[in-house]
């Protein structure tokens, strides 16, 4: 059962797999798990789509504290989600259009480098926009012809954009001041306070591109 997704990546319910597993295109691999490359050195795409990630965390937890000192109240709450995968669709789209940071670098070809989808090469010693890749079949040029095809978000392979999306957040922090009784009497009130609060002020994660709590 397909819940949602794109042509290269989706969320499915499949017997024997985690609920809402990330399902999509993957690189072809041999019996040892190594990526299979074509004659130019670029990775080949697996014939069938497969489960490429588990969005369900191993655990979620929170840690908070509420402190009072005289008329001042201070509280905070940390939350974490650990072990969940996420498909970075934003990263893939930025690569496709050549505006991701990794597509804007310049590299010098140490040898003649094959270009994806072409019989041409980047001549040894020349500078080109892009990176140098190696999947085990020799060095290749990762220029925009690669990123706008299977190296980007609109290609056939979603596996390359699935990463660990574990995170730690400072979910909330508050600081309040309770009005003293003489001020409350003057105002004719039983209680009152003034304070400041902030949410999601700190995010610790290795996931690139977006907040892993949001989609894509």
Regions found by a protein language model. Name each.
Residues 21, 34, 83-188, 192-193:
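Extracytoplasmic gating/loop element in the C-terminal half of outer-membrane beta-barrel translocons
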Residues 1, 70, 81-85, 180, ...:
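Structural signature of outer-membrane beta-barrel domains
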Residues 76, 194-196:
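Membrane-embedded beta-strand positions of outer-membrane beta-barrel proteins
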Residues 1-30:
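Polar, glycine-rich mid-to-C-terminal structural blocks
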Residues 26, 64-66, 174-178, 197:
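Outer-membrane beta-barrel architecture
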Residues 59-65, 72, 170-175:
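Hydrophobic, lipid-facing positions within transmembrane beta-strands of outer-membrane proteins
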Residues 1-11, 91-100, 207-216:
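Flexible, surface-exposed loop regions and adjacent strand-edge segments
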Residues 71-76, 182-183:
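Repeated loop/turn-to-beta-strand initiation elements of outer-membrane beta-barrel proteins
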């Amino acid at each position: 059962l397909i819940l949602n997704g794109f042509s290269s990546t989706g969320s499915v319910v499949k017997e024997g797999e985690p609920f809402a597993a990330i399902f999509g295109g993957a690189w072809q691999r041999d019996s040892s798990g190594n990526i299979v490359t074509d004659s130019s050195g670029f990775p080949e795409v697996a014939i069938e789509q497969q489960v490429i990630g588990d969005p369900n965390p191993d655990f979620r937890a929170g840690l908070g504290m509420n402190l009072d000192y005289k008329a001042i109240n201070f509280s905070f709450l940390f939350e974490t989600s650990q072990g969940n995968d996420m498909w970075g669709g934003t990263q893939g789209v930025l690569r496709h259009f050549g505006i991701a940071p990794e597509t804007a670098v310049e590299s010098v070809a140490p040898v003649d480098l094959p270009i994806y989808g072409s019989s041409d090469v980047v001549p040894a010693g020349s500078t080109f926009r892009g990176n140098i890749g190696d999947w085990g079949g020799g060095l290749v040029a990762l220029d925009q012809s690669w990123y706008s095809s299977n190296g980007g978000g609109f290609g056939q392979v979603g596996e390359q954009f699935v990463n660990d999306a574990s995170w730690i957040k400072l979910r909330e922090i508050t600081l309040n001041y309770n009005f003293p009784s003489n001020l409350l009497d003057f105002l004719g009130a039983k209680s009152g306070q003034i304070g400041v609060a902030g949410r999601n002020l700190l995010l610790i994660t290795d996931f690139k591109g977006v907040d892993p709590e949001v989609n894509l």
